[in-house]
């Protein structure tokens, strides 16, 4: 078969492959790719299509074998570097994925999406500083991509930069006014800033959207409940938490938060039951155990409260106020020595925080 006939046969196989693929007949489509590779081992199209299909079947390692073959043929085949990087990301091999995205960036520094992909891998590695740099690079190239702006707003939120997070949320909303995830981040940022009424406006936006995803609608009702609780609207907060539970009975945070609001209105027994529901869903939920302990404390069931606090300490010894709360419960039981040990632990933890703070300040000053 001469070169012309070979190319013509390859074109026919490419068409057949596409038809099989569209019909969901992946084995037949893969067989077409194998035929293409047999006809021309240097043909990129056979390996490339195979790589895509293997990716969709979640055979990420096998998919990467295809892209490695292409890279041997053409080291500057940017799509293969990108897809290899994505496969490695899916395999949680984040450092290796960054190598691939760096190679794609070297080939085309203005491909902003590869800065985004690199940023996502750095985010997964909790390298937030370099992740932010990547998002900034992407935004410098294209400041109209709502997804990149959202990723930066989310990272700013997680780093506690709430004011700046809101600014980027507003940029996203100017582009995509009904992006529920962005409204949720904006609302939570406002909540952290103590702007509870403004945060409720954001959560109500989400609640008013049609076809909202599960994460956003549950998050909106739950966070709205927290905002109402902070405003002292305890009954309204319970209505919100009930709405979350109606949508998703396994939403553990809503059960625990509901327990808090019930305690606020002195419905301590109901509060305990609500916390128990959260604990059934997640027995390692330290917050729910703590909330249950506080309600039992209010019911003067100090032994049971101590048991709850002990469970919290088992899960998270540094849980906020837990040693203090345990100390007071033990004090009520007239177990003074044990109580004092808890208060000593509070002092120790506070001193450690102070030392860490001083060390960080000293470190900053020494660099000046």
Residue map of PLM features:
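Canonical positions in the second alpha-helix
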Residues: 36, 69-70, 103-104, 137-138, ...
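Thr-biased low-complexity repeat/linker tracts and other Thr-enriched repetitive architectures
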Residues: 99, 167, 197, 201, ...
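TPR/TPR-like (Sel1-like) alpha-helical repeat modules
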Residues: 324-354
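Conserved alpha-helical positions within TPR/SEL1-like repeat arrays
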Residues: 14-22, 45-56, 79-90, 113-124, ...
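TPR-adjacent "capping" and linker segments in tetratricopeptide-repeat scaffold/adaptor proteins
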Residues: 1-13, 210-218
């Amino acid at each position: 078969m001469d070169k012309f006939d070979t190319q013509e046969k390859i074109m026919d196989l490419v068409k057949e492959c596409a038809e099989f693929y569209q019909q969901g007949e992946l084995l037949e489509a893969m067989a077409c790719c194998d035929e293409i590779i047999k006809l021309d081992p240097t043909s990129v199209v056979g390996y490339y299509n195979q790589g895509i299909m293997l990716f969709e079947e979640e055979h990420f390692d096998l998919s990467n074998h295809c892209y490695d073959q292409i890279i041997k043929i053409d080291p500057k085949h940017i799509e293969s570097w990108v897809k290899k990087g994505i496969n490695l990301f899916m395999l949680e091999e984040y450092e290796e994925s960054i190598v691939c995205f760096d190679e794609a960036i070297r080939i085309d520094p203005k491909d902003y999406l590869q800065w985004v992909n690199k940023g996502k891998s750095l985010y997964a590695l909790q390298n937030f500083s370099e992740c932010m740099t990547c998002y900034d690079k992407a935004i410098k190239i294209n400041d109209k991509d709502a997804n990149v702006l959202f990723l930066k707003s989310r990272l700013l939120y997680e780093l506690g930069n709430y004011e700046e997070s809101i600014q980027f949320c507003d940029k996203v909303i100017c582009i995509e006014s009904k992006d529920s995830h962005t409204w949720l981040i904006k609302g939570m940022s406002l909540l952290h800033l103590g702007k509870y009424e403004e945060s409720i406006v954001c959560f109500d936006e989400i609640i008013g959207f049609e076809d909202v995803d599960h994460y956003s609608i549950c998050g909106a009702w739950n966070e709205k409940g927290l905002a109402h609780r902070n405003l002292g609207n305890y009954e309204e907060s319970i209505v919100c938490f009930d709405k979350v539970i109606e949508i998703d009975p396994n939403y553990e945070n809503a059960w625990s938060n509901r327990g808090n609001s019930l305690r606020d209105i002195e419905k301590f027994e109901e509060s305990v039951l609500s916390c128990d529901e959260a604990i059934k869903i997640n027995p390692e939920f330290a917050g729910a155990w703590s909330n249950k302990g506080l309600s039992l404390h209010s019911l003067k069931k100090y032994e049971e409260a101590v048991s709850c606090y002990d469970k919290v300490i088992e899960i998270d010894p540094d849980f906020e106020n837990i040693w203090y709360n345990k100390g007071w419960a033990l004090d009520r039981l007239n177990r003074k020595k044990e109580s004092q040990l808890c208060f000593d632990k509070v002092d120790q933890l506070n001193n450690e925080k102070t030392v860490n703070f001083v060390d960080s300040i000293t470190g900053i000053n020494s660099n000046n």
